[in-house]
Amino acid sequence: MHWILALSLLLLLWLLVASPRLAWLKAGLLSLLLLLLSAWGLVDRLSGDGINAATLYHLRADMDGAGVSDFSGYIAVFIGMVLLSLSPLMLLRVRRFRRPRGGGAVFGAFVVMLLVSMAVSPVYRDGKRLYYQLRPVDYATVVPEYQVPQQPLQKRKNIVWIYGESLERTYFDEATFPGLMPNLRQLATEAVDVRNLTSTEGSGWTIAGMVASMCGVPLTTAPGDENSMGRMGLFLPEARCLGDYLKDQGYRNHYVGGADASFAGKGSFLASHGFDVVHDVNYFHDKGVAPKHFSAWGVHDDVLLDDAWESFQTLSRAGQPFMLTTLTMDTHHPAGHLPLACKNQRYESPLGDIGLLHAIKCSDRLIGELVTRIRNSRYGRNTIIVIASDHLAMPNDLSDVLAKQKRENLLLFLGKDIPPQQVVRRAGSTLDSGATLLQLLEPGMRTLGFGRSLLANDAPPSASVAASRDSGRDYPRYLAYARTLWTGRSTRMLRVNGNGDVVVGVQQVRPPVLLEYDDDTNLKTVYLENTSRQFDRTHSDGTLAYVDRCTAFEDGSADGDWCALVVDRNQHMKLYRDPDLTRGIAVDAPLDVTPQAPRPRVRQPIMLTQAARKTEAGRYMLELYAKRRPTRAFWVEAVSSERKVVLAQQWVVPDASGRIRMPVGLEHAVEDLGIRAWLDYTEEVSVDDLALVKDTAVADRS
């Protein structure tokens, strides 16, 4: 396919210069195609699998804490490709066209080759794959397969779960990586060593690998944009995970990780599913750990695993059963990091002096030392240790080598009463890790979510089997069911709670939010980004429900209350106000059939202040100048409490110079005062100057 794409691009370039007819249109289309391919190339270098579920997840999830500097080389190449993608536009400025005839035929051929290029491009392939994975499907047949543990534990052993970042079992291959991981290879001979463990769709990145192994479900975007972690109150609230079950059994769940817990919603996941303590990079900063012990991603593994050992001792002495979970970081792609404890440790390899190999060698030693400490302690006899890769390695400095190997995840179980054995399964994935641990804790337990114990010879149907059979034809059913775990299945009632969050099923979402229902009033899509634009452009066969401040819908609203605009398939509309939303509204209730005006263009809030400011009580005059502004009047508000409380509001019309004046009265001091405007998505405002002047006399005259 690659050679066909390359040939198609060359033909497109020739057809561009073959005729001057519609030359700028052809150049623009070719540049757009090249930009798409460049963007795909960057994403593929980061994900290792093109545009997939991980890409969609991270586009919406909180990216704070990502070690962006590690990928500066990829980004530099991408910038170069972007500039190269614009070359067709530049070519028209230097090329003199000498063939004035045949323009129509040339343009027709150009369009055909453009379609061919798209059809053979990886962008189309990935788009088609995502469509089949995320399209609405009937998941009813797999609902009985989702099982949660109910049986009480007879023996409550302590658990230490060590996730090795991208530390797949493939690195055990002595022929390719001789002597790279002697400690974990030795531990594998003393453990239940699971082989052929794959990562299914929805489990191939860190948070997804944790969700898959601890909940037995793939992590997939909720319908639409619910994976905007900052806007979701709960992380997979309908899932029942290992942490939830163990907490009910009297366990204390403790997590210590070196990265920022807010990255990709990891902290939200842990807090939502039974973890009592979540320590991340900020914990180590607060402890006063020296800067030399941090990388772009967080604290190094030597400091992290020392802290894990201290936590193990503290938790063990307390006498309460516990699960201690830790996640290493220094083997993160693309090149890894080396902590101070391993600065003098090198790995000699025929592959060359590769930093990632040094990092893997170090991780093997540090994890091995922690495991030895735990097993040799007086608490080791009552402890099960799990050593697992969170996912297969993403593109890194060893990708070309790994591509030639049989890839498999790492999963080891060690414990006093666990006889060593190598378990080989034809269809096993990280979805089955938690269920396998449960069987080791309690032999009669063999399921967790869609996961099945890999020790059971009579395991019932599972998502792992579905993913490996018939090219994964039935696997989208499991993905579809997993998406319902974000909101639940009873989503036809909407209400706004006392915190100003929209309650949808079991989920709480911070507005604005646009919900799209199908013709049977089943929740189809939830939009949390660009909601105003989405509302204007979405023409549904079902019902739309848009929830935001009444200011978004009405010119005459000045109360800051919540409203919901519901539009049915016949374009009948009804605006529900705050009292209705407090009680709750049914989106499938009949709407008035009186003649309706055209669907309004809904406004959205745009912050005019760059940062919130602390402001004392008093009367103020807000003065701002905006050279670029809407041609019509619009709302300006002063807000506080994370933009939830409206302190002042005015329907403003800038004067000829763009000046806006609005009185603001504060009865008490405000810690986070901000100024925002309400505009529709086609409008914009650019503030050149803004001042909040405390002047009682001026405020009174206004």
UniProtKB/Swiss-Prot annotation:
One GO term describing the cellular component: plasma membrane
Cell compartments where the protein resides: Cell inner membrane
Domain of life: Bacteria
Annotated function: Transfers a phosphoglycerol residue from phosphatidylglycerol to the membrane-bound nascent glucan backbones.
Membrane-topology annotation of the record: Multi-pass membrane protein
Family membership: Belongs to the OpgB family.
Protein name: Phosphoglycerol transferase I
Record organism: Xanthomonas campestris pv. campestris (strain B100)
